[in-house]
Amino acid sequence: MKLRDSLAENNSIRLQAEANTWQEAVKIGVDLLVAADVVEPRYYQAILDGVEQFGPYFVIAPGLAMPHGRPEEGVKKTGFSLVTLKKPLEFNHEDNDPVDILITMAAVDANTNQEVGIMQIVNLFEDEANFDRLRACRTAQEVLDLIDRTNAAA
């Protein structure tokens, strides 16, 4: 499942969302996937449990978090959601706080999780200007167009 197709088919983009805590921000992304029948509601708790155990493991770049759990933690099918925050939040990551872009990922198997999802997101942000371009997006279509332009350039 491609990042762009998943976001479009699942209607799983939320821009300029308001959250007061990192937990609320993660829940927004998971709730989009629950609504699209990609994950079960328990996926949210699995992500929180992962942070409790390993720290903010999914904050992968300055301003960018990629919340995800394991396939057996409530994943029904592979999919993504994308959330931008109106106000950046602290995720307690030493180097990459504050975060205002979250791409929540669910994958039915670990290989899909690592290879497909992470590579597509790396591709999107290889051009660092895309962080600010994404922050400037105000509609889901603008996000999809940005991904299309990035893929065309790759």
Curated annotation (Swiss-Prot):
What positions constitute the catalytic site? 68 (tele-phosphohistidine intermediate)
For this protein, the record's InterPro entries field holds:
Ascorbate-PTS_EIIA_comp (IPR051351), PTrfase/Anion_transptr (IPR016152), PTS_EIIA_type-2_dom (IPR002178)
UniProt main location, coarse: cytoplasm
Q: Which GO terms describe its cellular component?
A: cytoplasm
Task: Kindly summarize what the UniProt induction comment says about this protein's expression.
Answer: Induced by L-ascorbate. Repressed by UlaR.
Tell me the disulfide pairings in this chain: none
Q: Which CDD domains match?
A: PTS_IIA_fru
Keyword annotations of the record: Cytoplasm, Kinase, Phosphoprotein, Phosphotransferase system, Transferase, Transport
Q: Which residues carry this modification: Phosphohistidine?
A: 68
* Residue ranges of every copy of the PTS EIIA type-2 domain listed in the record: 6-150
Highest rank taxon of the organism: Bacteria
Pfam families according to UniProt: PTS_EIIA_2
Which locations, inside or outside the cell, does it occupy? Cytoplasm
- Write out the GO biological process terms: phosphoenolpyruvate-dependent sugar phosphotransferase system
Q: Name one GO molecular function term.
A: kinase activity
Its job:
The phosphoenolpyruvate-dependent sugar phosphotransferase system (sugar PTS), a major carbohydrate active transport system, catalyzes the phosphorylation of incoming sugar substrates concomitantly with their translocation across the cell membrane. The enzyme II UlaABC PTS system is involved in ascorbate transport.
Quote the entry's note on domains: The PTS EIIA type-2 domain is phosphorylated by phospho-HPr on a histidyl residue. Then, it transfers the phosphoryl group to the PTS EIIB type-2 domain.
Q: Which protein, by its recorded name, is this?
A: Ascorbate-specific PTS system EIIA component
Tell me which species this is from: Salmonella paratyphi A (strain ATCC 9150 / SARB42)
